[in-house]
């Protein structure tokens, strides 16, 4: 099944509008290219509606939030909704500051999102309007573990039902859920946390996958999460004694570029709940 989702990205090569952050914008663009889609990175309010119109999907990331881009995100999101385009939200660091929390919640109120992708702290912040986010990493009390997986899945399904979006909670164990079904994904490698922007890259990748698979947002988002985790595993095997996190970042992008749909199908490690 995930092979089909990935093959559709390669065949259709959707154009993805990214309003993302300046820390990871280059990596996000290269990740979109690596999977077979095409990126546009445009965040000026004067043009975002035009850019969104010519694209197939929209990825909104609040990582380096400022007052100028807030307007751009809202305008692009509403335009994408009017056009029926899928929209992904990455609420980076929601809960770490009042501005981030207020903006993430405002976006959720004013834009219909196809997928919401974040760590457990960020997603809990969206659900409650307040949080205990530690930087842009999940708070230690908010790690998804085997012991609390059932409750985390129930939370993800409930939030998906409330928002109408697929909810992708990523961490050591990833959860991708709609109101009725959840994928619990165990791909990935711990070293992925040593690179800034793997989550941002995943959100851009997710936008490409859901855009190429209309009507199948849950499966497409799960396929993207599996692909990113599998790329982390493949990339780690390439590391030599002299390689560090910069090499690892490049190897992850290379792994997506070289990954076949069949390789994803075989390597995806998940269960359905």
Predicted regions and their residues:
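Glycine-rich phosphate/adenosyl-contacting loop at the front of the ribokinase-like
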Residues: 1-41
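Conserved phosphate/ATP/ADP-binding segment of small-molecule kinases
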Residues: 100-182
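Conserved post-catalytic alpha-helical subdomain immediately downstream of the catalytic base
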Residues: 196, 206-248
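Glycine/small-residue-rich loop that forms an oxyanion/phosphate-binding "nest" at active or ligand-binding sites
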Residues: 69-118
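Active-site cofactor/substrate anionic-group-binding motifs, chiefly glycine-
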Residues: 31-89
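Buried hydrophobic packing segments
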Residues: 28-31, 203-210, 221-224, 252, ...
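Charged C-terminal helix
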Residues: 230-273
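Short pre-catalytic strand/loop immediately N-terminal to key active-site residues, enriched for Gly-Thr
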Residues: 185-196
């Amino acid at each position: 099944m995930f092979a089909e989702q990935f093959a559709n990205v390669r065949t259709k090569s959707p154009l993805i509008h990214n309003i993302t952050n300046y820390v990871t914008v280059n990596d996000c663009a290269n990740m979109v290219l690596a999977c077979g889609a095409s990126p546009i990175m445009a965040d000026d309010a004067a043009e975002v509606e035009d850019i969104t119109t010519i694209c197939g999907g929209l990825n909104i990331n609040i990582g380096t939030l400022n007052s100028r881009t807030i307007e751009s995100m809202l305008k692009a999101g509403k335009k994408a909704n009017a056009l029926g385009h899928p929209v992904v939200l990455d609420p980076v660091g929601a809960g770490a500051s009042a501005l981030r929390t207020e903006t993430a919640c405002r976006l959720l109120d004013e834009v219909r999102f196809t997928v919401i992708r974040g760590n457990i702290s960020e997603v809990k912040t969206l659900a409650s309007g307040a949080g205990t986010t530690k930087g842009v990493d999940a708070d230690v009390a908010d790690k998804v573990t085997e012991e609390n997986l059932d409750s985390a899945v129930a939370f993800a399904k409930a939030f998906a039902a409330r928002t109408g979006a697929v909810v992708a909670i990523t961490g050591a164990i990833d959860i991708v859920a709609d109101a009725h079904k959840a994928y619990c994904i165990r791909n990935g490698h711990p070293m992925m946390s040593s690179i800034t922007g793997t989550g941002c890259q995943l959100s851009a990748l997710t936008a490409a996958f859901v855009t190429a698979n209309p009507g199948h947002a849950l499966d497409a988002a799960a396929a993207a999460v599996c692909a990113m985790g599998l790329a982390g595993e493949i990339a780690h095997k390439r590391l030599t004694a002299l390689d560090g996190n910069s090499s690892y970042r490049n190897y992850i992008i290379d792994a997506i570029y070289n990954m076949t749909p069949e390789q994803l199908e075989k390597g995806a490690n998940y269960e359905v709940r």
